[in-house]
């Protein structure tokens, strides 16, 4: 029976630094501290960190000399976690909201649908306007196109149509992007 590879969580990926004695295979490091930047032996850097009751954290292992900092690792992890949560909060996922209308829509119903579309566009979401035909209404697809173009025109100050409306079988569809 084979063992499953472990799944790393988001926090594990964020904190992939080697700390103190876990930094191996290094004889000299570029040490960043309050005193400035210096190239010292690994043992000396570790000794300085222990004297200050702090941790020696490997920040970058990409260069010839590994870059290490003398910091409080617990506090550093907390700050990184806080920054990542703050960045995640600021992200906005764009959703596509759908507004369904009919070719013979009453004016009040049309205004309500338009108001909802404006709210969605104001929140930064895309709006998919779909007009559905029933039965013999398909014979008058030009009426449906007029309603859809009217909706696009009325929402012009809130968003722009991705492309011209497309008739797809028994419906006309257009997607409006927020400004």
Curated annotation (Swiss-Prot):
Q: Where is the signal peptide?
A: none
The record's listing under SUPFAM superfamilies reads:
Translation initiation factor IF3, C-terminal domain (SSF55200), Translation initiation factor IF3, N-terminal domain (SSF54364)
| Entry keyword Cytoplasm | yes
- Compartments, record wording: Cytoplasm
Which one of the record's GO molecular function terms can you name?
A: translation initiation factor activity
Domain of life of the native organism: Bacteria
- Give me the Gene Ontology terms describing cellular component: cytosol; membrane
Which GO biological process annotations does it have? ribosome disassembly
Which PROSITE patterns does this chain map to?
IF3
Record keywords = Cytoplasm, Initiation factor, Protein biosynthesis
Task: Read off the InterPro entries from this record.
Answer: T_IF-3_C_sf (IPR036788), T_IF-3_N_sf (IPR036787), Translation_initiation_fac3_CS (IPR019813), Translation_initiation_fac_3 (IPR001288), Translation_initiation_fac_3_C (IPR019815), Translation_initiation_fac_3_N (IPR019814)
Oligomeric and partner information:
Monomer.
Sequence similarity: Belongs to the IF-3 family.
Record HAMAP family: IF_3 (MF_00080)
Function of the protein: IF-3 binds to the 30S ribosomal subunit and shifts the equilibrium between 70S ribosomes and their 50S and 30S subunits in favor of the free subunits, thus enhancing the availability of 30S subunits on which protein synthesis initiation begins.
Name of the protein in question: Translation initiation factor IF-3
Organism whose genome encodes this protein: Leptospira interrogans serogroup Icterohaemorrhagiae serovar copenhageni (strain Fiocruz L1-130)
Name the gene behind this protein.
infC
């Amino acid at each position: 029976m084979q063992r499953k590879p472990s799944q790393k969580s988001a926090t594990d990926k964020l904190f992939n630094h080697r700390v103190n004695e876990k930094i191996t295979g290094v004889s000299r490091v570029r040490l960043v501290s309050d005193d400035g930047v210096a190239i010292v032996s690994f043992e000396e850097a570790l000794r300085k960190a222990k004297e200050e009751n702090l941790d020696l954290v490997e920040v970058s292992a990409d260069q010839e000399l590994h870059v290490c900092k003398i910091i409080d690792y617990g506090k550093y992890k907390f700050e990184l976690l806080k920054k990542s949560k703050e960045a995640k909060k600021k992200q906005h996922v764009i959703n596509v909201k759908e507004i369904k209308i009919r070719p013979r829509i009453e004016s009040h119903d049309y205004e309500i649908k338009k108001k909802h579309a404006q709210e969605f566009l104001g929140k930064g979401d895309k709006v998919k306007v779909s007009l559905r035909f029933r039965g013999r209404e398909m014979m008058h697809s030009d009426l449906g196109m007029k309603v859809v173009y009217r909706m696009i025109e009325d929402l012009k100050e809130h968003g722009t149509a991705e492309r011209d409306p497309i008739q797809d079988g028994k419906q006309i569809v257009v997607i409006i992007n927020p400004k």
